[in-house]
From Swiss-Prot:
It comes from Stenotrophomonas maltophilia (strain K279a). Belongs to the Gfo/Idh/MocA family. Glycosyl hydrolase 109 subfamily. Residues 1-29 form the signal peptide. The keyword NAD applies. SUPFAM superfamilies: Glyceraldehyde-3-phosphate dehydrogenase-like, C-terminal domain, NAD(P)-binding Rossmann-fold domains. GO terms for molecular function: hydrolase activity, acting on glycosyl bonds; nucleotide binding. This is Glycosyl hydrolase family 109 protein.
């Protein structure tokens, strides 16, 4: 059924399992510097670059972007941090410049922060070159992309980490502590999603100094994400951005480590929000953007069934007016947490049939990573999450240890997108979820955020 044969995975998985015996933070690694490159210095890339240049154990040796303005901003950031100037690629707008970057000698790892469609080919090429990959979320576009990325990682042994920052969100990590200590009892049902009004991100004026909420252009006339992300709303209908929600839920339920997804289906509403936005923002129906037919349903609801009996519901909601929320709900036999109302209820501890404020529980169950690093992470992007995810990648790379969000996590979470598209296109069909681990999920043990190091 799939391009990579089961026996190939079994053989390769054995090697990966052996690598899990490596020590997490050997003493020799503590003072080691890593030489990192970055492909993609757009708005997201600059946020991650900020975290790299503030570290004494990282040397940024190469940067690549085909937009000279953004490459220039990246170079300015490195200079202001007092770090040596890295070699640059792409200022001539050569779309293959990233390949030359990967030929540069002495690169330990690369951060990939480009448009989604480039993630898989860039990660594959980097791993084939022996360069460790820290990939921004979305591991691939098609299901075959995910098998190809996985096959390359297993055959080369080159480290790969999906840079899913929400796994490190403060309340999310406190909830992880609660799950592991049995506060919710046995988990039964979880919910999450990417619920974020992106209308002002998918469209802008095309002005590099006004990337958000500034117009209705997209594609070649847009800037930043409006230049590429909006096209996915035109051409695709599915759960386009699953990992922010599914990442924490997968950690809670032990996906790929004692548990797995078995089935998936998805439903999509009609598409109205982006059209109405362009009409209202442009003041009529004459602008070309108002005539575009968007394929992406305004709300996409995806349901996953797990081997151990849990269900997980995801919602993708980016085309309608709304406040930001991930919509987390973690529910078990003893109670539940819901992040929308910042509330929790634990049977035998909470007043009957009443919510309690989550904050006091969060303080009680604060994860050791946040206890140790809250002050350091305070100035980082996304409430500190970006510091933690970069810290994890760098520390694991220095220690030659398994990545805390590994290749199996990456392809499993990201494959929800093409599978949801397939389900919707086939009258909301329920599909079997592929086992990317080839059965290794039965023996693999959880490693994420256990030792207080990363």
């Amino acid at each position: 059924m799939f391009a990579m044969k089961r026996r190939e995975f079994i053989a390769a998985s054995a090697a990966v399992a052996a690598s899990s015996l490596l020590p997490q933070t050997p003493a020799w690694a503590r003072g080691r510097k890593v030489r990192l490159a970055m492909i993609g210095t757009g708005m997201r890339g600059l946020v991650l670059l900020k975290e790299l240049v503030r570290r004494d154990d990282v040397e940024v040796v190469a940067l690549c972007d085909i937009e000279p303005i953004m490459l220039g901003r990246a170079m300015d950031m490195v200079a202001k941090a007092g770090k040596p100037a890295p070699k640059t690629y792409g200022q001539d707008r050569d779309t293959h410049a990233w390949k030359r970057l990967l030929e540069q000698k002495g690169i330990d790892g690369v951060i990939i922060a480009t448009p989604w469609e480039y993630h898989a080919p860039m990660a594959i090429a980097a791993m084939q070159a022996g360069v460790a990959v820290g990939c921004e979320v979305v591991a691939g576009i098609t299901l075959q992309d995910h098998w190809d990325v996985l096959k390359t990682q297993l055959s080369t042994g080159t480290p790969y980490m999906l840079l899913e920052n929400v796994c490190y969100r403060r309340d999310v990590m406190a909830a992880l502590q609660m799950v592991r200590q049995g506060l919710f009892g046995e988990l039964v049902h979880l919910q999450a999603g990417y619920q974020h009004d992106l209308r002002g991100v998918k469209f802008n004026s095309g002005d590099p100094n006004q990337p958000y909420d500034s117009g209705v252009e997209f594609g070649p006339k847009g800037w930043s994400e409006a230049r590429w992300r909006t096209e996915h709303s035109v051409e695709r209908n599915g759960e386009l951005y699953p990992s922010h929600g599914i990442g924490p839920c997968a950690m809670y339920t032990g996906i790929n480590r004692g548990n797995r997804f078995t089935h998936i289906n998805a439903f999509a509403t009609k598409a109205r929000g982006l059209h109405e936005y362009t009409v209202a923002k442009s003041g009529g129906t004459t602008h070309p953007s108002t005539k575009v037919k968007f394929k992406l349903g305004d709300i996409v609801t995806t349901t996953l069934a797990c081997e151990n009996g849990e269900t997980i519901l995801l919602q993708h909601d980016t085309s309608l007016p709304r406040p930001y929320s991930m919509g987390f709900r973690v529910q078990g036999t003893k109670g539940l947490w819901m992040d929308v109302n910042h509330s929790i209820h634990i049977e035998g501890r909470s007043p009957p049939h009443q919510w309690e404020e989550f904050k006091k529980y969060q303080d009680e169950y604060e994860h050791p990573l946040w206890k140790q690093n809250a002050d350091t992470a305070a100035s980082a992007g996304h409430g500190g999450m970006d510091w933690f995810v970069i810290h994890a990648f760098v520390e694991a790379l220095k220690a030659k240890a398994p990545m805390p969000i590994d290749i199996y996590d990456a392809v499993t979470w990201s494959a929800i997108t093409p599978l949801s598209e397939q389900s919707i296109a086939n009258s909301f069909q329920t599909l079997e979820f592929p086992d990317f681990t080839a059965g290794a999920w039965k023996q693999r043990k959880p490693i994420f955020a256990f030792d207080g190091k990363y």
